Swiss-Prot record:
Source superkingdom: Eukaryota
Physiological role: Regulator of microtubule dynamics.
Source organism: Caenorhabditis elegans
Region annotation Disordered: where it falls in the sequence: 136-180
Compositional bias segments (type: Basic and acidic residues): 136-158, 169-180
GO BP, sorted A to Z: microtubule bundle formation; microtubule polymerization; positive regulation of protein polymerization
Transmembrane segments: none
Gene Ontology molecular function terms on file: tubulin binding
The protein, known as: Tubulin polymerization-promoting protein homolog
Classification of source organism: Eukaryota, Metazoa, Ecdysozoa, Nematoda, Chromadorea
Homology family: Belongs to the TPPP family.
Length: 180
């Protein structure tokens, strides 16, 4: 039944788009995987998880490809025909109408989208880590009022280790502490 369906598109033009999705994730790939097939359908707006689901496409893909799990361009067309057949069974429309609707959406799509990739934003991290008001104890001395680090002077207490005895610290502090 699916084999009788015809494709109303320019094969060479769609083949270029098919190649782009085939190479998505593997630049040297020559056959499309089920994952890339689902991405192609999802980016085109065909795979909506209501009328056409990933399960439907997975079953159709494995019917055509069998154990090899990858499809050539002609095999991909057969998979599309199976998907259109499943969709037509649900919608009670002719298979050719469903296939035309699917192929029209796929033909409009240029290349895989890479939307949703997270971009690192470190501005919040730096402002949080250099906000001296959030630190307590000796750590709050590491930054000045603008949040700029003081360097070694903020990390270490500098004392003068000079005097008449080797371990004597804080030279000239006796008179200050004993009131003389």
């Amino acid at each position: 039944m699916a084999a009788a369906a015809g494709f109303n598109w320019d094969d060479a033009d769609v083949k270029k788009r098919w190649d782009a999705f085939t190479k998505f994730g593997a630049a040297t790939a020559t056959e499309m995987t089920g994952k890339n097939f689902d991405k192609w359908l999802k980016d085109a707006g065909v795979l909506d998880n209501k009328a056409i689901t990933g399960t439907m496409t997975g079953i159709a893909f494995s019917k055509v490809t069998g154990p090899k799990k990858k499809a050539t361009f002609d095999e991909t067309k057969k998979v599309l025909a199976f998907v259109a057949e499943d969709r037509a069974r649900q919608s009670k429309k002719p298979i050719q109408d469903e296939l035309d609707a699917i192929t029209e959406k796929l033909a409009k799509l240029e290349a895989p989208s890479v939307g949703g990739a997270a971009k690192a934003n470190a501005a919040g991290v730096y402002s949080r880590l250099t906000d001296h008001t959030k630190y307590t104890g000796a750590h709050k001395e590491r930054f000045d009022a603008e949040g700029k680090g003081k360097g070694k002077s903020g990390r270490a207490d500098t004392t003068e280790n000079t005097g008449y005895v080797g371990a004597y610290k804080n030279k000239d502090s006796y008179d200050k502490t004993h009131g003389k």
